[in-house]
Design a protein with these regions (language model features):
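A generic structural signal for nonpolar/aromatic side chains embedded in well-ordered alpha-helices
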Residues: 24, 69, 110-112
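Short beta-strand segments
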Residues: 27-61, 69, 77-81, 90
Length: 161
């Protein structure tokens, strides 16, 4: 697997990256899926940030989602669909690995300066390595369109009737 951060994805497909970032920017809270100790899935709410070419996941100290990611870094992140059934710009989700940032004081400082967490001295910060980005939307009221990006591959688009 190629290591791929947000900047690498945005360089590979700027249009899809802008749409995905817009969807995540439409609402504050999104859904993060992690794996529990026994391997079963856990879903929790989360705020995300796109800063300095990275997708960041910040968490309260010793939150169960942070402990899950320390044990198994795989995650899935689903954008908040918002109210109703409109879902302008479609449904988007991101899969990847979350890498805790505990040895890069400059990255933590820049995140704190931008985000201003409640306690800047006590939180978990993870950068992400993307394994896939998926957008699903309806086109012309006729097609369900699924766009899938994976590192090192072009975007694959499937239209279903």
């Amino acid at each position: 697997m190629d290591r791929s951060n947000w900047a690498a994805f945005a360089a590979a497909d700027p249009g899809l990256a802008a749409t995905v970032e817009k969807r995540f920017g439409a609402f504050t809270h999104h859904v993060l899926a992690t794996l529990r100790k026994d391997g079963s899935p856990r879903t929790t709410g989360l705020e995300v940030r796109f800063l300095h070419g990275e997708l960041w996941l910040g968490m309260m100290p010793n939150s169960v989602k942070a402990l899950d990611l320390r044990r198994d870094p795989r995650f899935a992140l689903q954008a908040n669909p918002g109210p109703g059934t409109d879902m302008a710009d479609g449904d988007v989700r991101i899969g990847g690995r979350a890498i805790e940032v505990d040895d890069d004081a400059e990255a933590v400082r820049r995140y704190v300066d931008e985000v201003n967490p409640p306690d800047p001295s006590a939180f978990h910060l993870f950068r992400t390595e993307l394994t896939e980005v998926v957008r699903t939307y309806v086109e012309d009221d006729a097609y369900l369109v699924v766009q899938v990006w994976k590192p090192g591959e072009p975007v694959r688009t499937v239209r279903r009737t």
